[in-house]
């Protein structure tokens, strides 16, 4: 399956637009990781634990997007966008939300 951020796939023609397809991944916060990320932020540098979490979340969201698109009969997803956000649970933590959205299509 082709999954791309572009609306056009060079050398391919869209036979049918099947609709919008979305996928979401939600992670709970980890107090220990948050603590060390906070220290790293104070002294400078990158927070590798969060970078890895974002990378993993994006990969999982794209995999789920592909699975849902296949169920719609698609062989490609065009115009995908990945977004991140947080959902505040309480004063002690939040959830990390990663969403992927695109248009499921059938290529000729």
From Swiss-Prot:
Similarity field: Belongs to the UPF0145 family.
InterPro entries: UPF0145_dom_sf, UPF0145_YbjQ-like
UniProt source species: Trichodesmium erythraeum (strain IMS101)
Protein name: UPF0145 protein Tery_3795
A Pfam cross-reference name: YbjQ_1
């Amino acid at each position: 399956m082709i999954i791309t951020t572009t609306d056009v796939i060079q050398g391919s023609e869209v036979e049918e637009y099947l609709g919008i397809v979305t996928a979401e991944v939600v992670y709970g916060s980890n107090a220990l990781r948050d603590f060390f990320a906070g220290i790293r932020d104070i002294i400078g540098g990158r927070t590798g634990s969060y970078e890895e979490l974002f990378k993993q979340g994006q990969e999982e969201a794209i995999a789920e997007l592909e699975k849902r698109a296949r169920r719609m009969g698609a062989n490609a997803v065009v115009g995908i966008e990945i977004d991140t956000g947080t959902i505040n649970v309480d004063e002690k933590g939040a959830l990390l939300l990663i969403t992927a959205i695109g248009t499921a299509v059938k290529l000729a």
